[in-house]
């Protein structure tokens, strides 16, 4: 009997040994990690006109991180500590990690909560016996200047031109027409005006209802389970149109491709300049993750949940080359899903990864962002500016000539009279 049990357990033991050995090997070869995550649970971005609750239910106001969101981000930090405990120093080392956030309260607070879970102070870093937390820097830039993490950028007219083209596509029109009656009905309930395209108000309504339901707040009678489900479907389709359906590579070059390019450049700096940096953390939004995954061609079509995290790991192989593995943590009950770049199995050689990403990386973002109309306007404006400057210079030159002549007359003529 014992012999039979041993025989039955042998395959499982070897399997576990193989998994453990493989994991240890990958950990030993790990060189650099990038973690891009969405902020935690928040209050609604806005309310709809007929919302019976309005802003009064949210203690810190609309758009703000909730206590549940803080807990979610803290748990994300603890997950990252468990996963990279043998890679990162056990104590905070400013040379090993760099954290950047978009300039929003909820993302800045999410970054801080995650760092609290990743780097609980110990030893000499305990600065107060009653506070098991330490301040760690989180960097940001003004939202109006953030092209790395906040998409789409308002100063990219070509992107909005692409979206106007997208909504003219038959696939888009067919979907919108199928929801026409539904959207008219919801518009009446919410106080919005029904439109022929999927307006942002549809997402606002869904977002408000989702947040209220998540916090056990009663929904209006018209917001049945079927209504909320359809609103979710419409919102997901609307999101999909921003990264798929019509000129996807060009859309990516103007949005998520910017972040892909930055990640590759940062890794190149780490390798070529022998930088001690081991991890980059980006605290951002669902739109950031969608744009990134859209550029990578791994977007699953689902809305990224709170605290979802896209991880990119860079490894050094035995032959000196590097490879890339990607993981997506969109739930907490299981380990992250491994993602494979289309056309390259995981782990993907870095050279192949870079080549596959080339079509979504812009060589001149400002130029690519200029629509035909805005480019012509800019050229016309430049020509007008040159003409105006030429006229001003001409007038100024003529004025100076007249003034000099007058001065010459004033000081030169008396001398002539004296000589005479």
From Swiss-Prot:
- Recorded protein name is Testicular acid phosphatase homolog
One Pfam family hit: His_Phos_2
EC number(s) on file: 3.1.3.2
Q: Which family does it belong to?
A: Belongs to the histidine acid phosphatase family.
* Transmembrane parts of this sequence: 386-406
Q: Which cysteines are joined by disulfide bonds?
A: 156-369, 211-309, 344-348
User: Do you know which InterPro entries this protein is assigned to?
Assistant: Acid_Pase_AS, His_Pase_clade-2, His_PPase_superfam, Histidine_acid_phosphatase
Keywords carried by this UniProt record = Disulfide bond, Glycoprotein, Hydrolase, Membrane, Signal, Transmembrane, Transmembrane helix
Spans within the Cytoplasmic topological domain: 407-420
Its quaternary organisation is:
Homodimer.
- Is the keyword Hydrolase assigned to this protein? yes
- GO CC annotation: lysosome; postsynaptic membrane
What GO MF annotations does this protein's record show?
acid phosphatase activity; protein tyrosine phosphatase activity; receptor tyrosine kinase binding
Main localization, broad class: membrane
Catalytic reactions on record: a phosphate monoester + H2O = an alcohol + phosphate
Indicate the segments annotated as coiled coil, or none if absent.
none
Q: Which residues form the signal peptide?
A: 1-24
Which species is listed as the source?
Answer: Xenopus laevis
